[in-house]
């Protein structure tokens, strides 16, 4: 039967083999598909147009049905960006309405960015403007970065009232009320939420950014799948941003946006000026101080060490660096343009192992007389009045914000972005006040599309492996790395402690049942030291034979005597016959019944060889 700990190790080994076997199976499947054994052919499902209840009246909803064209609902911008070169000022990015490159649902179309490295702008008028009042505001859409994303956005601009009058003039300066959606450049991304809020006192409109999570990774852009972005803003100012139905971040307009929506009650008076006699210096130079007479400012900081001597192995005849003898002038070297060619310098091999080469110079050391430039010490300024600041006055533009009061009505939805990637597909754009409608649209569109994309990836072998999924999860939630490390280290530590943490138990010491010599006796260490031998000798003197001619031995236990007497005679005869030869050799060491027992020291002197077993027997008798 296997030891329990080795059984545990064996089971772990089997688990590793099984994982590798699964990997081999996947590889075999890939090889089989390459060798001609085809997987089940993927057949796209048919698109079913989403439907809302008759009572539902969203402000805007477009799922881009077959037959939709640019210029009908969606108007491409003809404007130019301000303050940029004319070559890149135009919004000349191309748009189309069509199917994605990899079709998972037949007949499911979307609005597609067809070009990269260009400015794109397009907008559509809402069926009914959204006015911020007692109802929630909900914006929802899905977007797919088919080519990934190097640098660019995928966000919506919810345009303020008035923009719908001229959608062809839509550009980056067009006023918007809310900007919402993903944006990425480089190795980091974010999901924007920006409010433009109007101060009711002075009429100024300012941008306020929702606080972002520390990191959301790049999976939304790099996995080439469709993702659903949902924004909910309540009249209380509470907002939540979700991706694929899962909360990404949330907060409140009154406390979690930057800068604060609530202006300060007091501000500095810009007309207040600092008095001319206001002294802000905490310390000043002591004008009464003078330089000490022994202060020499001309002493250098370092001086030559006069006590230094040249090392005995210093070679002044060799240079520390020499031209590389193996270097060759490049073939394209032009002496007229590049000057005279010189071989690069390398360390002189003749100086290897020496203290140095070339002209020897004594090293420098810190000058003990150096004191530097003298400056007057600082003292407290008797005229110090503290740090001056303008006086505070009541803020004339202060107001107590109510979240929805400063948000302008929304009349159009636009997409205005610069991107370095093409084939960005927007779909199922919804503006409403009903969370139920948003949930229903997501069920009828995104979740079906998500499952079909997974099915397509599985059928074509383009799905991400388990390792990539783990990495993608850590991009979204970096703290998962700590969980992964613990999940790996803790079992390894447990296995190590379980298998190797305990020492082996020492073998039990079994007492011999007879003094018969055995081959291992010579390898047993002498257990009697010099002091114990003296004690043994004294005990043996006390145990010399008495008048009766016998040694004063301790009484024999009655049970042992009976055990000896009960041994079969045949056993004794066989034992005596088998040991007759040994008795002849050990005759000198046997104490006969009628002979007095000699002291151990005398026996040792007469015996030509005292074995380890004999020493132990002597020690036991002495005890």
Swiss-Prot record:
Family stated for the protein in its record: Belongs to the calreticulin family.
Region (4 X approximate repeats): 269-336, 339-396
SUPFAM superfamilies in UniProt: Concanavalin A-like lectins/glucanases, P-domain of calnexin/calreticulin
Compositional bias ranges of the Basic and acidic residues kind: 266-276
Location(s) in or outside the cell: Endoplasmic reticulum membrane; Cytoplasm, Perinuclear region; Cytoplasmic vesicle
Biased composition (Basic residues): 614-623
Residues holding Ca(2+): 108, 427
Pfam families on file: Calreticulin (PF00262)
Role noted for this protein: Calcium-binding protein that interacts with newly synthesized monoglucosylated glycoproteins in the endoplasmic reticulum. It may act in assisting protein assembly and/or in the retention within the ER of unassembled protein subunits. It seems to play a major role in the quality control apparatus of the ER by the retention of incorrectly folded proteins. Required for embryogenesis and larval development under heat and ER stress conditions. May be important for germ cell development. Involved in neuronal necrotic cell death.
Sequence repeat residue numbers: 269-281, 286-298, 305-317, 324-336, 339-349, 358-368, 372-382, 386-396
Acidic residues: bias regions: 277-287, 314-323, 556-565
Organism, as annotated: Caenorhabditis briggsae
Gene from which the chain derives: cnx-1
PTM (free text): Glycosylation is important for its biological activity.
Signal peptide: 1-21
Glycosylation sites: 202
Annotated region described as Disordered, given as residue ranges: 260-337, 536-623
PANTHER family, alphabetized: CALNEXIN 14D-RELATED, CALRETICULIN AND CALNEXIN
Designated name of the protein: Calnexin
Span list, region P domain (Extended arm): 267-400
GO biological process per UniProt: ERAD pathway; IRE1-mediated unfolded protein response; protein folding; response to heat
One annotated Gene Ontology cellular component of this protein: endoplasmic reticulum membrane
Major place of residence: endoplasmic reticulum
Membrane topology: Single-pass type I membrane protein
Residues noted as binding an alpha-D-glucoside in the record, renumbered to the chain: 155, 157, 176, 183, 416
Keyword Calcium: yes
Biased composition (Low complexity): 566-581
